[in-house]
Amino acid sequence: MFLRLFKYLWPERYLPETPAQDPFDENPPPCGPGRVGVLLVNLGTPDEPTRGAIRRYLGEFLSDPRVIEIPRYLWMPILHGLVLTMRPKKLAPRYAGIWMEEGSPLLVYSQRQAAGVRQGLAARGVHAEVELAMRYGKPSIPAAITALRERGCDHILAVPLYPQYAASTTATVVDAVTRHAGRLRDQPALRFVKRFHNDPAYVEAQAGRIAEFWQAHGRPQKLVMSFHGLPRYSIELGDPYYRDCLDTARLLRERLGLREDEVEVTFQSRFGSARWLEPYTEPTLAELARQGVTEVDVVCPGFVADCLETLEEISQECRDAFVAAGGRQFRYIPALNDCPPWIEGLTDLVERQLRGWPTGNP
């Protein structure tokens, strides 16, 4: 009965042709432990500083329900009717102003980080394939996982390059990785790094970056630690991001030997009309200048690679606001990027997370 129904629904002419040689192996070779893959994931970037490329990137980014947590039927008309028609024109010259010869700073530095981890693991005798992916844009997560699988990786460690956990950053990477892996017939074993906001390797590299900058340029009156903002409702719903940011700031302050009154913790990149985490970075800088603070350094510990938010929003827009309010000296301390201590620290973090997996000689 079932066989007759099957033949009726799927006639023979629609079934795949039987190969000349049966691919089924009755005596398959023994399955080894497989290889280990490391997937580093950052946020993403347009392919080029043009309106079209920016529109495609923003369309993917802002369509993620983890990023914009309002009903789709309300948000999608706004996104396609207003945001994607207006924002690309405004952002194109800003991206062009920070573009490097090799491409987008975020992509260039992330590629260097991946290359550094690859070399660092090999130097330690850890056999692992390393790929870089972007949550939005290229190289995509599916493409990177496919590349790892084609090289025999059946264990994959995903490392979202966000020190502080947030549902709109780290969790959406987990969503994307598991969604793609879930479609595979032979699924790899997966691990994820949830956060590394208080990891000694990260804290030491970030503190060292600041100390090295001060050794070369001197110390300011105030150090502003600016983190990417989030809507307050995200925290009220249980997101630990705010706590993670404060923990990172405290650890850096203690490592640098600074008093509490020498450091300001602020939040940047507000989007939309909702109330976000406060204090906001730009108004805080202007207020510091009005209070008589003439020298500030700004560091962005939540960004491990420089991007539009650091090179344009902080280094240019916030500088202008500080100077316009009476400040004299504004300096942006670059992100960790590909500085050797961070590459070493990131390699340490990855190596620890790979323990128990087959990373010996393949």
Curated annotation (Swiss-Prot):
An example Gene Ontology CC term for this record: cytoplasm
The entry's keywords: Cytoplasm, Heme biosynthesis, Iron, Lyase, Metal-binding, Porphyrin biosynthesis
Chain residues that bind Fe cation: 228, 309
GO molecular function terms noted in the UniProt entry: ferrochelatase activity; metal ion binding
A Pfam family that the UniProt record links to this protein: Ferrochelatase
EC code: 4.98.1.1
Main location: cytoplasm
Pathways involved: Porphyrin-containing compound metabolism; protoheme biosynthesis; protoheme from protoporphyrin-IX: step 1/1
Nucleotidyltransferase is among the record's keywords: no
Any single GO BP term: heme biosynthetic process
Enzyme class: lyase
Protein's cellular compartments: Cytoplasm
Enzymatic reactions: heme b + 2 H(+) = protoporphyrin IX + Fe(2+)
HAMAP family associated with the record: Ferrochelatase (MF_00323)
Similarity section: Belongs to the ferrochelatase family.
Alphabetized PANTHER family for the sequence: FERROCHELATASE, FERROCHELATASE, MITOCHONDRIAL
Known role: Catalyzes the ferrous insertion into protoporphyrin IX.
Protein name, as recorded: Ferrochelatase
Source species: Bordetella pertussis (strain Tohama I / ATCC BAA-589 / NCTC 13251)
